[in-house]
Curated annotation (Swiss-Prot):
Belongs to the universal ribosomal protein uS3 family. Part of the 30S ribosomal subunit. Forms a tight complex with proteins S10 and S14. Gene3D superfamilies: 3.30.300.20, Ribosomal protein S3, C-terminal domain (3.30.1140.32). Residues 214-252 are annotated as: Disordered. Residues 38-106 form the KH type-2 domain. One of its GO terms (cellular component) is cytosolic small ribosomal subunit. PROSITE patterns: KH_TYPE_2, RIBOSOMAL_S3. This is Small ribosomal subunit protein uS3. Keywords: Ribonucleoprotein, Ribosomal protein, RNA-binding, rRNA-binding.
Length: 252
């Protein structure tokens, strides 16, 4: 019944790790609500920075927030000014010392959340949903994805009755636990109402032991409780242009 479950939750502890790492104790509910508040704030504050995951780790007096993004330069800012501002803002949310780490996503076309949000933003810009989805699928397959599936639901083309339409290329073996499948859901807010976009991306199969850290294989751009002052950080290269649309040019 792999089709009925969230592919990420279904693989936790097997080939996927957790995005929140801490011991809750009696304050579990408060910390969980605070994690949700931090993630919601970061995604709203950095909406133009192509943020995917926000990983939160806690000790007694320190909250470590790790942000994975396709455009780290926007978050860091000139001389680390922007990341310092973000750190101070998160301090007010948590009432604790905050450390921010930034990791670059090298291939955003293989990140389900970035693909889903890119499709949603294009639909909001009145681009045909079929065109947006087919461009996203082509971009992912060019980056050597083994398969991708997109399901869109809502009042498509302004139809009177809501319906769903699916697009698929390659293979998505949802019942195979060793299959490395990324999944995400995004919403497009249009004049006809909300549309839901679900994306599954098959990256390959995992054999043997695997590092369950969500950051395995990523490049760290900046870290530290102060966010760092070590000059301008390079802006991450992405196959998504400024409007959030996949760039049709093939990466060399």
């Amino acid at each position: 019944m792999g089709q009925k479950t969230n592919p990420i939750g279904n693989r936790l502890g097997i080939i996927r790790g957790w995005d929140s790492n801490w011991y809750g104790g009696n304050d579990y509910g408060d910390k969980l609500a605070e994690d949700h508040k931090i993630r919601k704030y970061i995604h709203a504050r950095l909406s133009k920075a192509s943020v995917s995951k926000v990983i939160i780790e806690r000790t007694l007096k320190l909250v470590t927030v790790t942000i994975t993004t396709a455009r780290p330069g926007i978050i860091i800012g000139k001389g680390g000014q922007e990341v310092d501002k973000l750190k101070e803002e998160l301090k007010k949310v948590t009432d604790k010392e905050v450390q921010i780490n930034i990791f670059e996503i090298k291939r955003p076309e293989l990140d389900a959340y970035l693909v889903a949000t890119s499709i949603a933003r294009q639909i909001e810009s009145r681009i045909s949903y079929r065109r947006a989805i087919k461009m996203a699928i082509a971009a992912s397959m060019r980056m050597n994805a083994e398969g991708i599936k997109v399901l869109i639901s809502g009042r498509l083309n302004g139809a009177e009755m809501a319906r769903s339409e699916g697009f698929k290329e390659g293979r998505i073996p949802l019942s195979t636990f060793r299959a490395d499948i990324d999944y995400a859901l995004a919403e497009a807010h249009t004049t006809y109402g909300r549309m839901g976009i679900k994306v599954w991306i098959m990256k390959g199969e995992v054999y043997g032991k695997r590092d369950l850290s969500p950051l395995a294989g990523m490049d760290k751009k900046q870290s530290g409780t102060g966010g760092g002052k070590g000059g301008d950080a390079p802006r991450g290269k992405s196959n998504f242009n400024k409007g959030g649309k996949p760039d049709a040019r093939k990466r060399k």
